[in-house]
From Swiss-Prot:
It is a multi-pass membrane protein. Residues 1-216, 282-292, 352-366, 460-506 are cytoplasmic. PANTHER family: POTASSIUM VOLTAGE-GATED CHANNEL SUBFAMILY G MEMBER 4, VOLTAGE-GATED POTASSIUM CHANNEL. It comes from Mus musculus. Regulatory subunit of the voltage-gated potassium (Kv) channel which, when coassembled with KCNB1, modulates the kinetics parameters of the heterotetrameric channel namely the time course of activation, deactivation and inactivation and on the voltage-dependence of activation. Potassium channel subunit that does not form functional channels by itself. Reduces the deactivation rate. Modulates the threshold for activation by shifting by approximately 20 mV in hyperpolarizing direction. This is Voltage-gated potassium channel regulatory subunit KCNG4. Heterotetramer with KCNB1. Does not form homomultimer. Keywords: Cell membrane, Ion channel, Ion transport, Membrane, Potassium, Potassium channel, Potassium transport, Transmembrane, Transmembrane helix, Transport, Voltage-gated channel.
Length: 506
């Protein structure tokens, strides 16, 4: 009699890990030899075209979704809590129909209106002792089938059990999110009923600013925001051209420089207005300033106003000897603040699902990125002294002047960038370089797989949430339109026959 999955786990000679487990490479176990005819003696599929087998007390005939199986009662002895095994204890037709959908007393055939594919896998487990998930069936639906037939899900193979547990966690998380959304909707509906005109206007403003899919105002607002971000990026790039830099160095401001300033002022005015609108509609003002995108907005907008304040200041008459150093400091501050304008590009994350996925992946993979930095730090600390010693012992031109100076070479080599500014010339140094490059490839590959899977999962999750929100909005719109039609029909019913419109009735 073959062992079940639980028995094989307890038996040291029958340990078997799924293909998904990395331990299968470290501890390969031999597959047990199959006994010819063992499966047929424990379970047998009977075709519909075959003659019905004779009813006896040693076998049970099961019909699941039109597929018939013949199982000896001895096969079910190892599973006394299963649904099929409990049929053996039934003494009346009423007890039998409580466990199955129908029963034919002449042929002693039990009928079940269940998934035949899932039952085929369960029959294979009853006969051969190996339970796996059905690829073409949802894991949660297969779990329901296991619960119906009285088979514990812990009998699944390790790889399939991990997959099922992962699906259960995802389903639980989705239910929690849906419950939170329903709670928010109930609170929003309750607040809308009791809200004043100001609250309703704030809700409309929130939908326009935060949700581009809420309607035409939201789409127009999002398009304008993206347009101004693109305009700011273009103006920033144009302002760094040699002609503009030469004018800036001379302290002159021609018409072209003036146009760039006007474009930047218009964009900053729009961004300031958008920031104020987001702040006004935010229910929690403190939580608003903690948002990462709002912090980016502040860092991107503030340099413009600070640069205006700094440029308006001038040294007093008594400080004329140090005016040159003062102007140099002011110019440095202006250049640094001007470079911060590139943060406007990060505002696109409000309207881009890909950028939102990237930010969510970085937040979820903080541990993986930390491990990557740790691996790189250890490897750089290892290879920098080696290449320094190898190159200094050769007695050639010294490019590696010190161990800290070799850190740059180690980082560039391990990330496979290879600028070529520092190149080992000796054979030992080249061997160290080869080792560092190979180590860098392996180190970068270890967390890359986990980060990629997290990115893919986060993208699908955000896309699913967006589709759910859009579907919910469509349902609300359909519900509102249906309610309006019902209201109009009720009003028409109230109008007397001699009148044609509610206005005339009034």
């Amino acid at each position: 009699m073959p062992m079940s999955s639980r028995d094989r786990d307890l038996h040291p000679g029958h340990h078997h890990f799924g293909s998904c487990s990395p331990l299968s490479q470290l501890w390969p176990g031999p597959e047990p030899k199959s006994v010819k005819g063992l499966y047929y003696s424990r379970a047998r599929k009977v075709g519909n075209q075959d003659a019905s087998p004779e009813a006896n007390l040693k076998e049970i005939l099961v019909n699941v979704g039109g597929q018939r199986y013949l199982l000896p009662w001895s096969t079910l002895d190892a599973f006394p809590l299963s649904r099929l095994s409990r049929l053996r204890l039934c003494r009346s037709h009423e007890e039998i129909t409580q466990l199955c959908d129908d029963y034919d007393e002449d042929s002693q055939e039990f009928f079940f209106d269940r998934n035949p594919s899932a039952f085929g896998v369960i029959v294979s487990f009853l006969a051969a002792g190996k339970l796996v998930l059905l690829r073409e069936m949802c894991a949660l639906s297969f779990r329901e089938e296991l619960s119906y037939w009285g088979i514990e899900e812990t009998n699944l193979e390790r790889c399939c059990l991990r997959k099922l547990l992962k699906k259960l966690e995802e389903a639980a998380e989705l239910r929690r999110e849906e419950a939170a959304q329903r709670q928010q909707q109930r609170q929003a509906c309750h607040s809308e009923v009791q809200a004043s005109r100001w609250a309703r206007s704030m809700n409309q403003l929130r939908e326009m600013v935060e949700d581009p899919q809420s309607g035409l105002p939201g789409k127009v607002f999002a398009c304008l925001s993206v347009l101004f971000v693109a305009t700011t990026a273009v103006s920033l790039c144009v302002s760094t051209m040699p002609d503009f830099r030469a004018e800036e160095g001379k302290g002159e401001c021609t018409r072209k420089c003036y146009y760039i300033f006007v474009v930047e002022s218009i964009c900053v005015a729009w961004f300031s207005l958008e920031f104020c609108l987001r702040f006004v509609q935010a229910p929690n003002k403190c939580q608003f300033f903690r948002g990462p995108l709002n912090v980016i907005d502040i860092l991107a907008i503030s340099p413009y106003y600070v640069s205006l304040a700094v440029s308006d200041e001038s040294p007093e008459a008594g400080e004329r000897p140090s005016s040159s150093s003062y102007l140099e400091k002011v110019g440095l501050v202006l250049r640094v603040l001007r470079a911060l304008r590139i943060l406007y590009v990060m505002r696109l994350a409000r309207h881009s699902l890909g950028l939102q996925t990237l930010g969510l992946t970085v937040r979820r993979c903080a541990r993986e990125f930390g491990l990557l930095m740790l691996f790189l730090a250890v490897a750089v600390t290892l290879f920098s002294p080696l290449v320094y010693v190898a190159e200094n012992e050769s007695g050639r031109v010294l490019e590696f002047t010190s161990i800290p100076a070799s850190y740059w070479w180690a980082i560039i080599s391990m990330t496979t960038v290879g600028y070529g500014d520092m190149v080992p010339r000796s054979v030992p140094g080249q061997m160290v370089a080869l080792s560092s490059i190979l180590s860098g490839i392996l180190i970068m590959a270890f967390p890359a797989t986990s980060i990629f899977h997290t990115f893919s999962h986060s993208y699908l999750e955000l896309k699913r949430e967006q589709e759910q929100v859009q579907a919910r909005l469509r349902r609300l719109q359909n519900t509102n339109s249906a309610s309006e039609r019902e209201l109009l029909s009720d009003v028409d019913d109230l109008v007397p026959e001699g009148l044609t419109s509610p206005g005339r009735y009034m």
